[in-house]
């Protein structure tokens, strides 16, 4: 007889597009970054790169730039320009929580689950977002790719969250995000719940193709899914 799956004890949440409204900020910052490198908006090359950015939403941004430019110095230059542009957008008031996100995180923690916020951004950008939202203490832990080794779609951040929170079993993990790479990360980490949300980059078909076990309208529905196990 197969043993029942243990109840979820750890929730690993994405930020932009899942708990934080993106509103096209990534694409705006990408446009600013490529402009510094002389890439003309509207050109065929710019369109090709933007398609790749959209397809790989959730991936570590420096990894995206390495793929696009194939040269470390150029990738680092683009990444610095991207971060500067993104920080300007945050400082200009373009950063806001998605409806119900704060309440969902609070409900999950009140229900005894540990919550970890993860991102494909650098630590500097992640902290900028957290500071802008007043979210420094909203979660048990926050992680970026540099904290774990590799970013999405690799399982490193999820497994680092498991280790840092002393969670016993990968089956006690729920991963929630808005991109296919979030789903792949959850699957590769062995999470029992891999929940996609429709508030960000990718549609239900992409989320399910990449391994979603559930697709929710938004993160606001996540406590209802996970906390019913505790009843």
Feature-to-residue mapping (PLM):
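Conserved Lys-Pro-Asp/Glu-containing loop-to-beta segment of HAD-superfamily phosphomonoesterases
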Residues: 152-183
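A short, structured active-site edge motif that brings together acidic residues
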Residues: 52-54, 135-151, 172
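Substrate-recognition element of Asp-dependent hydrolases with the DxDx(T/V) motif
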Residues: 30, 101-133, 143
């Amino acid at each position: 007889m197969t043993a029942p799956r243990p109840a979820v004890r750890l929730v690993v949440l994405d930020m932009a597009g899942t708990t934080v409204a993106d509103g096209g900020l990534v694409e705006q910052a990408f446009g600013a970054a490529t402009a510094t490198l002389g890439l003309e908006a509207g050109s065929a090359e710019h369109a090709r790169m933007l398609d790749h950015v959209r397809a790989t939403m959730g991936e570590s941004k420096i990894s995206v730039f390495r793929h696009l430019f194939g040269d470390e110095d150029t990738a680092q230059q683009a990444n610095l320009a991207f971060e500067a542009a993104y920080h300007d957008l945050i400082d200009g008031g373009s950063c806001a929580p998605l409806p119900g996100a704060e309440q969902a995180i609070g409900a999950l923690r009140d229900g005894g689950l540990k919550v970890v916020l993860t991102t494909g951004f650098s630590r500097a950008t992640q902290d900028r977002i957290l500071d802008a939202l007043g979210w420094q203490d909203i979660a048990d832990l926050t992680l970026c790719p540099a904290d774990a080794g590799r970013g999405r779609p690799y399982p490193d951040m999820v497994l680092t969250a498991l280790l840092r929170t002393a969670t016993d079993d990968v089956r006690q993990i729920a991963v929630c995000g808005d991109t296919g790479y979030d789903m792949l990360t959850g699957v590769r980490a062995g999470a029992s719940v891999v929940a996609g949300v429709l508030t960000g980059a990718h549609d239900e078909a992409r989320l399910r193709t990449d391994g979603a076990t559930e697709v929710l309208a938004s993160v606001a529905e996540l406590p209802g899914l996970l906390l019913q196990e505790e009843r």
